[in-house]
Amino acid sequence: MTAQLQTSGNAKTVLVTGGAGYIGSHTVVELIENGYECVVVDNLSNSSYDSVARLEILTKHHIPFHKVDLCDREGLEKVFKEHEIDSVIHFAGLKAVGESTQIPLRYYHNNILGTLVLLELMQQYKVSKFVFSSSATVYGDATRFPDMIPIPEECPLGPTNPYGNTKYAIEKILNDLYNSDKASWKFSILRYFNPIGAHPSGLIGEDPLGIPNNLLPYMAQVAVGRREKLYIFGDDYDSRDGTPIRDYIHVVDLAKGHIAALKYLDAYNQKEGLCREWNLGSGKGSTVFEVYRAFCKASGIDLPYEVTGRRAGDVLNLTA
């Protein structure tokens, strides 16, 4: 089958770390549809090679894949040697807020060290364009400031959990690296909110290997009988129904945002480089109960649920 798959000739090659994962896989589709070639690196800790195979079916393109952990410098350098990388979109990393409060050292080691190894190799191989998958968790509890909901990019940062701290630390690293050599780097930092949904083909979507950390896949697993009930973490927040408010953005829209950010870097031709942050959200906040009721209505299933205590590190409102 691979021999029949297309390539795009002299197209620019983008290294997509975490490209077998939820957001990464959808972004690979958009990259190929926009004329880029992709190389996917993933350690498959929360995904499977099946998603890469599905991407090849979906795009009718051969997609080089390397099972490599970013902390493995030798393994990652082989990828840079084998492919002429033009730019990097960096998704790879641990990403569960609650879990990060339980195993913080693993989060700091994996997310920060992996990014450092990646940046060092980019510097060594003179790859200057970098789109970073950051998170709205870097803002922490924006309600502690007046007039900061919806959250603007200039909102003061203050993450409330180790996961958010790793994203904040990486943002600081990128700013420091840019300021050390402004002519050599172009950085797009994308702070996004809560991705949901799946590709319209139905071939790819959010299907984590373990217990889902996001609301929609958890509800889906309850609906098909893989989980007994939905757990709602807290109904005593100062919201319209007591549950936290989140900004849910469709994953395909989010993927298109990464393409826009990369094209912005491609077209940016100023003497100095760039290091800029953007929020990616829908601009509309919905409570957990509102999403729950919408899911039940759409599926025709009244999902069983149980309200438990608040999850460590969660905040009231994250809306773009």
Q: Which residues make up each language-model segment?
A:
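Short helix-coil transition/hinge motifs at the ends and kinks of transmembrane helices
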Residues: 144-148, 201-202, 268-272
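C-terminal substrate-binding subdomain of Rossmann-fold SDR/epimerase-dehydratase oxidoreductases
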Residues: 215-320
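The catalytic Tyr-centered alpha-helix of NAD(P)H-dependent dehydrogenases
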Residues: 159-166, 208-215, 247-251
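N-terminal Rossmann-like NAD(P)+-binding domain of SDR-like oxidoreductases, especially those catalyzing
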Residues: 1-198
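Pocket-edge positions in alpha/beta enzyme catalytic cores
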Residues: 68, 80, 107, 207-211, ...
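Oxidoreductase cofactor-interface core, primarily capturing Rossmann-like NAD(P)-dependent enzymes
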Residues: 190, 201, 229-232
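Hydrophobic, Gly/Ser/Ala-rich alpha-helical and linker tracts in large acyl-processing enzymes
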Residues: 199-212, 219-222
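Secondary-structure transition/hinge residues
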Residues: 126, 178, 182, 200, ...
